[in-house]
UniProtKB/Swiss-Prot annotation:
<feature type="compositionally biased region" description="Low complexity">
    <location>
        <begin position="311"/>
        <end position="326"/>
    </location>
</feature>
<dbReference type="GO" id="GO:0008284">
    <property type="term" value="P:positive regulation of cell population proliferation"/>
</dbReference>
<feature type="signal peptide">
    <location>
        <begin position="1"/>
        <end position="22"/>
    </location>
</feature>
<feature type="glycosylation site" description="N-linked (GlcNAc...) asparagine">
    <location>
        <position position="142"/>
    </location>
</feature>
<dbReference type="InterPro" id="IPR003961">
    <property type="entry name" value="FN3_dom"/>
</dbReference>
<dbReference type="InterPro" id="IPR003530">
    <property type="entry name" value="Hematopoietin_rcpt_L_F3_CS"/>
</dbReference>
<feature type="domain" description="Ig-like C2-type">
    <location>
        <begin position="27"/>
        <end position="104"/>
    </location>
</feature>
<comment type="subunit">
    <text>Forms a heterotrimer with LIFR and IL6ST. Interacts with heterodimeric neurotropic cytokine composed of CLCF1/CLC and CRLF1/CLF-1. Either alone or in complex with the heterodimer CLCF1-CRLF1 interacts with SORL1; this interaction may promote internalization and lysosomal degradation.</text>
</comment>
<protein>
    <recommendedName>
        <fullName>Ciliary neurotrophic factor receptor subunit alpha</fullName>
    </recommendedName>
</protein>
<dbReference type="Pfam" id="PF00041">
    <property type="entry name" value="fn3"/>
</dbReference>
<comment type="function">
    <text>Binds to CNTF. The alpha subunit provides the receptor specificity.</text>
</comment>
<feature type="glycosylation site" description="N-linked (GlcNAc...) asparagine">
    <location>
        <position position="60"/>
    </location>
</feature>
<feature type="lipid moiety-binding region" description="GPI-anchor amidated serine">
    <location>
        <position position="342"/>
    </location>
</feature>
<dbReference type="InterPro" id="IPR007110">
    <property type="entry name" value="Ig-like_dom"/>
</dbReference>
<keyword id="KW-0325">Glycoprotein</keyword>
<keyword id="KW-0472">Membrane</keyword>
<dbReference type="InterPro" id="IPR003599">
    <property type="entry name" value="Ig_sub"/>
</dbReference>
Length: 372
């Protein structure tokens, strides 16, 4: 009967371990969510446990040092972003979970940056906003748009969460718009507002499909073409004018040309053989401001291809060279002794190097003797 005792001990130990595991991992009530400011100090109580209760603290499953405790409370100094996490307090002997805190470290919001722009005039405009610095915790924004005393609907952008769209109800209105935005989070609140006239926020998107090409046989010309921005809804009724800038890559200074109409321009003063960068901006003909610059186009003016001599072109020169090589040099004359009045019979010609003037005089004398 002595043998079953060890087995009984093992069973008791296993049951005890199961109880401890169940106590540490059994479902508990949702942790308390707490927000604290970056750089501050915080004291986390262990639920309803007495101050002198023997407890152990863990964060995200890792034990914390005992020197961080003040009794049963956990004290954290100079909070950093890395302090965010799930803090749990256990009874030191039984490992019974006493309390949980989900700590978020962040900042209150600063005054938001708000701007409005009409790139689809005269259909409407949009407003967008952002915080100048991150808060590291969730923020809630609320936007209000007034046209005079009338509240306008601001439809949320389907893709950009910090943007909404407003449709113009009355074109060419002299009544100002006022857009207000407030932002809040668990640590604070802030707000701002802007007021503007309809025409002051008109700003088209940049021109599209900017292309630059060399002009054949013109080493100083580049032909530039572009398209009106596709977001501009009615270019016939609300025409755009354009501003073109260009420069060779070797220089930093831009040259500018303002164009009242059309979507093409020929640059006539380009440096031959130098690569150029070209950009175009757009603006409503009467109101608003210039768009941002378009995507840059690059091009190099036409250059003449170097001419390479062909075999056919070289042939006449070879013939001429061969013929001239057979001619006597200026100071050399091929003479026949018979021509010099030697009286002998025909013989092979031989070379006599004499000055040209002497050779001509000798030839003249020979001719006179033959006439006599």
């Amino acid at each position: 009967m002595a043998a079953p005792v060890p087995w009984a001990c093992c069973a008791v130990l296993a049951a005890a371990a199961a109880v401890v595991y169940a106590q540490r991992h059994s479902p508990q009530e949702a942790p308390h969510v707490q927000y604290e400011r970056l750089g501050s100090d915080v004291t986390l109580p262990c639920g309803t446990a007495n101050w002198d209760a023997a407890v152990t603290w863990r964060v995200n499953g890792t034990d914390l040092a005992l020197d961080l405790l003040n009794g049963s409370q956990l004290v954290l100094h100079g909070l950093e972003l890395g302090h965010s996490g799930l803090y749990a307090c256990f009874h030191r002997d039984s490992w019974h979970l006493r309390h949980q805190v989900l700590l978020h470290v962040g900042l209150p919001p600063r005054e938001p940056v708000l701007s409005c722009r009409s790139n689809t005039y005269p259909k409407g405009f949009y407003c967008s906003w952002h915080l100048p610095t991150p808060t590291y915790i969730p923020n809630t924004f609320n936007v209000t748009v007034l046209h005079g005393s009338k509240i306008m609907v601001c439809e949320k952008d389907p893709a950009l969460k910090n943007r909404c769209h407003i449709r113009y109800m009355h074109l060419f209105s002299t009544i100002k718009y006022k857009v207000s935005i407030s932002v809040s989070n668990a640590l604070g609140h802030n707000a701002t507002a802007i007021t503007f006239d309809e025409f002051t926020i008109v700003k088209p998107d940049p021109p599209e499909n900017v292309v630059a090409r060399p002009v054949p046989s013109n080493p100083r010309r580049l032909e530039v073409t572009w398209q009106t921005p596709s977001t501009w809804p009615d270019p016939e009724s609300f025409p755009l004018k354009f501003f073109l800038r260009y420069r060779p890559l070797i220089l930093d200074q831009w040259q500018h040309v303002e164009l009242s109409d059309g979507t093409t321009h020929t640059i006539t003063d380009a440096y031959a053989g130098k690569e150029y960068i070209i950009q175009v901006a757009a603006k409503d003909y009467e109101i608003g401001t210039w768009s941002d610059w378009s995507v840059a186009a690059h091009a190099t003016p036409w250059t003449e291809e170097p001419r390479h001599l062909t075999t056919e072109a070289q042939a006449p020169e070879t013939t001429t060279s061969t013929t001239s090589s057979l001619a006597p040099p200026p100071t050399t004359k091929i003479c026949d002794p018979g021509e010099l009045g030697s009286g002998g019979g025909p013989s092979a010609p031989f070379l006599i190097h004499v000055p040209v003037t002497l050779a001509l005089a000798a030839a003249a004398a020979t001719a006179n003797s033959l006439l006599i």
